[in-house]
Amino acid sequence: MSRAKQLCVGVAAAGLVGLGSTVATVAVASADTGNSDAGSSSSAVKAGSSAAQPKARTSPQAKAVRTNEALSQPAAASRKTATAGRTTTATSAAELVSLALSTVGSATPGTGHSRRGVVMTASAAAATGNNATVTTQSTTPTHVLVIGIDGTNLSAILSNPDNVNLQALISTGTTAASTMVGHTTMSNPSWTGILTGVWSETAGLFNNVFTPWTYDKWPTIFNQLETYDPGIQTTVIADWENIAQIAGAGSIPADSIKFFPKYNNSWLDTDDLVGQASVDAINNTTAGVSSFNFTYFVGVDDTGHEYDAGSPQYAAALTNVDQNVGEIMAAVNTWNAAHPDEPWTVLVTTDHGQVPWPTIRLGSDMRAHGFQTPWETTTFVIANGPGFEQGAINNTYSNIDITPTVDALFGLTPPSYSAGKPLMDLAGSDYKPVAPGFDAIKQALTDAIAMYGYPNVVTNVALDLRTIVGFVPYFVYTVFNGLTADMSAPLKLPIQFIGALLYQATNIPAQIIARLTGVTGNQIIPPDLWPYTTVPGTQPEPPATAVPTPVAIAV
């Protein structure tokens, strides 16, 4: 089933915040990660004859829930000493903005040289272009799972008691209510930051058009791990094409990539396919072989675009992901019970939040994020596993810390250009609420969320302008990508050619404005003028599920 990026337009009112610290802004933006049935990348191939089935949809009340105890990780090892913690737990908006818009001339990108099939020594790994060096060579296999839930408000996780599995991970791990104020709240730039450790301004991204050359310059975590040790099994399972494209980018892509297009005209059903495939991947993990899994869910974000983040539909989409997380964690715990000497570390994060009110629509979709309201810039990180304190809070964590953390867990020193730090190095800022239990954690995280605000006036206007301008080439790209998705080759190429011309006619001016508004790493003239790229790992459409016959109930 082909898909295209959903589009939306909206009006963002930043408002007036004390002495002109922010201004009212009116903007037009793109919706982010969800893809409609209009079409996806033209070369996405449906191969094979069978695929995982989505689970039967049940109400949260009817779904078997798991207690915190059932989801808890094995006994944690002693906490690592904080060696490079951030200086403060609460940075002013002005300081964050200054950091976000500063130049990055000292950053040295990596090159991601191919090492497929080559067993690397520690010295060889230290010499590779991604600047990651070996700190330890552990003989114990390492297993790490990162779960990405797009467009998710931490407040929505905390407020709904049906989100029992994510709340259990919070209760048995260390959690941050963090902010990315001063950085764009678009998915492609944000997930690139999460998966490379480099902020989008440095990487040169500001909209959702995938640019493969970005990851030749800034290697992904998959590139870094595969360069260090090709024996690490790297797996990516997602239902947004950009994630599959990022996983396949660079000279050393992830070992296994599965991309699920929209199924049954339902992102909840599609998220279920991602969840089941993730359970299968964990169950099939080979003992004695290190593994890194990245599981990505798009349904929450896409539902927020269609309705809003305060709607019952958004809450239901999040609860559906929560149920999938419960099944994934059950698989992790079962695997851990069978292999107690090889515990898993589980990290959960999001790329941005969403506004919980209706905004202007384009078609069926709304502008739900892309600007600088606290709803959009508030993010979260949950860290669960050995070395992370149970029931703790650490608001110095950020989603930019994910790649450095994974590097460190596998024995690598993160590249010198990384904007983040390993979460283990920030342990000095851990704290626990005075009162025990989840309610106290919930209140402490809610209080942290309430502290976050807008950037200063100049930054707010600059980022809004960047979002508006970046929407134009993205809109052109998406329209032509959707038009040509199911066309036959003779007609497809000339229409794509026209689309490429129009795209670059809007993209190059947008790149200039992006540079002027703080995107220091972009290329005004792209190295490849053809914007259409393949989507690796596209999965076949499962057989349609039968619609049950309604049964009359006597009352």
Task: Give the positions of each predicted feature.
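Composition-driven, intrinsically disordered low-complexity tracts enriched in small residues
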Residues: 1-140, 432-555
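Metal-dependent active-site segment of extracytoplasmic phospho-/sulfohydrolases and closely related
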Residues: 145-146, 165, 320-366, 406
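Short, structured active-site-proximal loop/turn typified by the sulfatase FGly-forming signature C/S-X-P-X-R
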Residues: 155-190, 198
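Substrate-binding rim/cap in mid-to-C-terminal beta-strand-loop elements of soluble/periplasmic
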Residues: 191-197, 367-410
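Catalytic-site neighborhoods of secreted/periplasmic enzymes
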Residues: 205-207, 213-267
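Active-site His/acidic residue clusters
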Residues: 244-256, 278-327
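Histidine-centered active-site microenvironments of extracellular/periplasmic hydrolases
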Residues: 349-384, 436
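Polar, surface-exposed loop/tail segments
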Residues: 412-443
